Structures are given as C-alpha cells and as structure tokens.
Amino acid sequence: MSILSIVLTGFGLAMDAFAVSVAKGITLTRVKAKDALKVALFFGGFQALMPLIGWGAGRYFADYIKAFDHWIAFILLGFIGGKMIFEALKEEDEEKAEVAVSMEVNKNKEREFANMKRKEELSAKNLTVLAIATSIDALAVGVSFAFLGISIVQTIIIIGIITFVLCFLGVIIGEKLGDIFKNYAEIVGGVILILIGINILLEHTGIIEKLFS
C-alpha cells in the first residue's frame, strides 16, 4: 500500500468527522482556537486509534464489526442530531413564552446560555460519542491493514493528522455558516448529523449502490 493510497484512505475516513466538525462550528458561538483544537484532537485521536484497534483484532473481528457498524453510527449520530433539534425547538418555544426584560439582562442571559452550551457541546462525553460514531469505519478498515504488510504506526499517524487538520478547519468553517443561519444554527447542525448517519446506513446496506447501479 503506497503512501498516496494511505493519504487517500485518510481523507476518505475523515469526511464524516469533518462534516460533524462543521456541525459543531455551526452550533457554537464565537469559536476560539482552543475549541477547534479540542474537537480536532478528539476526532483525530479516535480516527488514529480505531485503525490501530482494528489492526490488532484481525480478520475474524472484521466480519463481526461489518455486520452492525453502520447501525451503531446511525443510532449514535441520529440520537445526537435529534437531541440537538429537539433542544433548539424547545428553546425557541420557551423564548416565545418569556416576558420581555431589559436589553442588558437579555445580553447577560445570552452570554450565560452561550457559555453553558459551549461546555455541553465541547464536553468530553459529547465529543467521545461523536468521535466513536464517525470512526467506526476506520476500525473496520484497520483490520484490513493487518494483512497488507504496511507500517501501522506510519499509517495511523497520517490518518490522524489528516483528520485533525480537516476537523480543525471544519469547526472554523462551521462558525462562518453559523453567522448566516443564526437562530437555526443548532437545527442545521442536528440535521447534518442525522443525514451523515443515514448516509452511513445507506452506504453499508448497499442501498445507494443499488439505486445508482
């Protein structure tokens, strides 16, 4: 397996993580470099770790994972995406029911809410769930690496770096999109996650291939 093939594989595996990173950037306000760095580290780290686990597990484990990996990704992404949409709609209803208060109080509440939302979106638990969901494919691919006679250390470093860079940029790009979508940012982010989950499910069940064959 050539370096070029490994790089292309890395880009392919990183696409879901990149899309989720864009969704993260959309739902966050005033993204800081450390926010993008945290997301990139989680996604890049898991994208490198999963192939290593798969490589160590062997061919037998590959058959086991392939049977349900798409369902795991679909359920995790669908749940997180649905939760984001539900919370966004709930917040919108609550805002309509609130009595008008002074502009200064509103600004303080918005800042408090933004800080609380940032902590939730960037929590280790939240990022771990998303990182696992978007790196399950890498686990299955990693199993095949065991039979290709390649340097697994070099391979996972390349894959990890590619994912890290793409996800860092994804968060920044997402923030710019968030300025456009404004109040609908979290709904858009949730929809993106659900669509990614559906895409993974359709690809692995062969439905997309049948539709375009």
From Swiss-Prot:
This is Putative manganese efflux pump MntP. The gene is mntP. It comes from the Bacteria. One of its GO terms (molecular function) is manganese ion transmembrane transporter activity. It holds the Pfam family Mntp. Belongs to the MntP (TC 9.B.29) family. The keyword Transmembrane helix applies. It is a multi-pass membrane protein. The chain crosses the membrane at residues 3-23, 36-56, 67-87, 130-150, 152-172, 187-207. GO terms for cellular component: plasma membrane. Keywords: Cell membrane, Ion transport, Manganese, Membrane, Transmembrane, Transmembrane helix, Transport.
